[in-house]
A protein has these predicted regions:
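A contiguous, well-structured pocket-lining segment that forms one wall/lid of small-molecule binding clefts
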Residues: 190, 194-263, 270-281, 285-288, ...
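A short helix-loop
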Residues: 2-4, 11-12, 27-29, 128-132, ...
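Glycine-rich beta-strand-to-loop/alpha-helix junction loops that act as flexible
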Residues: 74-77, 140, 265-273
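Short, well-ordered amphipathic alpha-helical segments that serve as non-catalytic structural scaffolds
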Residues: 32, 50-65, 247-252
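Short glycine-rich, Thr/Ser-proximal phosphate-binding strand/loop in the N-terminal lobe
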Residues: 6-49, 155-162, 288
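Conserved phosphate-binding catalytic cores of ATP/NTP-utilizing and phosphoryl-transfer enzymes
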Residues: 1-2, 105-135, 303-307
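Short beta-strand-loop/turn "lid" adjacent to the catalytic site in phosphate-handling enzymes
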Residues: 60-97, 101
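Glycine-rich phosphate-binding/hydrolytic loop that grips phosphoryl groups
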Residues: 116-120, 289-316
């Protein structure tokens, strides 16, 4: 059990998140950024504005226990790469640094992707995976990637190396765009899932691949054509998910052939989808987080901060 009391902050698109890890238990709070009906996202300037307004509200939900924090973890960029940057993370970074100075505790920075992976492992009670290499899929509106994760002994807890990705649209983008076509709220994943499950047809889908990388740009056009032809919403939703899942399945198969039968982890909001979870668990024995730890959250940075403070991944 993690003993360190740690605070996690994450201000990504499209959720303001805070989490408190105390006595091994996680309290996680979050608030979606407001997106107008019919729109499929926010400009970064708007995201920064809404995070600035919402973060104090989200922090208030954690109550006075924050004063017992001994470390803070914060998401500072989308991915663990030098060219990875997004202005919305500056809101969380600024809050973390101010709190760290006020409380006299260390602030540890991690990528948003590392946070997703850590939250999924924590939720599935599989932090032991950090002791050896594994494949981690991060599926969201901004990312559709598989990375090779490996233990790190320089204080980072673990490192990630890009192994496969979408060459164009991301899985979450496709789902959100098709959802908006169907008149669903944004983000659309949680609303598209039950529609797809209600479809009585068996949809045959073939993935468009280049090596282990996938292409998802054609899925939106297929679904748009179905909508224009008057197809039931359930059929459109099921078609969307069938093609997305076929692509992820093909990526996983190619990577297992390349790297061997490594453990496979799924994180990110798209990983909440029930059809994806069922297929990947049955076929690959994949590890999934609880849905609330799949979507954007700050549990991952809190877990990683605690691991850092407890010496995990540090050279002895």
């Amino acid at each position: 059990m993690l003993e360190t009391c740690a605070l996690g902050l994450d201000t990504s698109n499209y959720t303001t998140s805070a989490a408190l890890l105390q006595n091994g238990k996680m309290t996680s709070c979050g608030k979606l950024l407001p997106v107008k009906p019919g729109e499929i996202g926010l400009r970064q300037s708007d995201a920064v504005f809404h995070h600035t307004r919402q973060l104090p509200q989200v922090m208030a939900q954690l109550g006075g226990a924050v004063r017992h924090v001994r470390a803070i973890g914060v998401s500072d960029r989308p991915r663990d790469a030098e060219d990875s940057y997004m202005p919305c993370f500056l809101v969380g970074i600024g809050a973390a640094e101010m709190l760290g100075q006020a409380l006299g505790v260390p602030v540890h920075r991690f990528s948003h992707q590392q946070g997703h992976i850590a939250a999924a492992l924590y939720s599935a009670q599989r932090l032991d995976c950090l002791e050896r290499p594994f494949l981690a899929f991060h599926l969201s509106g901004g990312t559709t990637e598989a990375v090779l994760a490996a233990p790190d002994h320089t204080g980072k807890v673990f490192t990630t190396q890009l192994a496969a990705r979408s060459l164009d649209l991301k899985a979450g983008q496709v789902i959100d765009r098709v959802g908006v076509l169907l008149g669903l709220p944004f983000p659309a994943g949680r609303h598209l899932d039950p529609l797809a499950c209600a479809c009585g047809e068996k949809i045959r889908a073939r993935a468009s691949m280049k090596g282990a990388d996938c292409s998802l740009s054609g899925v939106e056009n297929k679904c748009r054509a179905l909508v224009e032809s008057g197809a039931p919403k359930e059929t459109v939703a099921a078609t969307c998910m069938a093609y997305v899942i076929a692509a992820i399945d093909a990526m996983c198969a190619a990577l297992r052939e390349q790297y061997g039968a490594l453990p496979v982890l799924f994180s990110g909001g798209v990983s909440s989808n029930s059809m994806l979870r069922a297929q990947m668990t049955e076929k690959y024995g994949a590890v999934f987080a609880e849905p609330r730890f799949s979507a954007d959250n700050a549990a991952g940075p809190a877990v990683l901060a605690a691991l850092r403070e407890e010496g995990f991944g540090c050279a002895s």
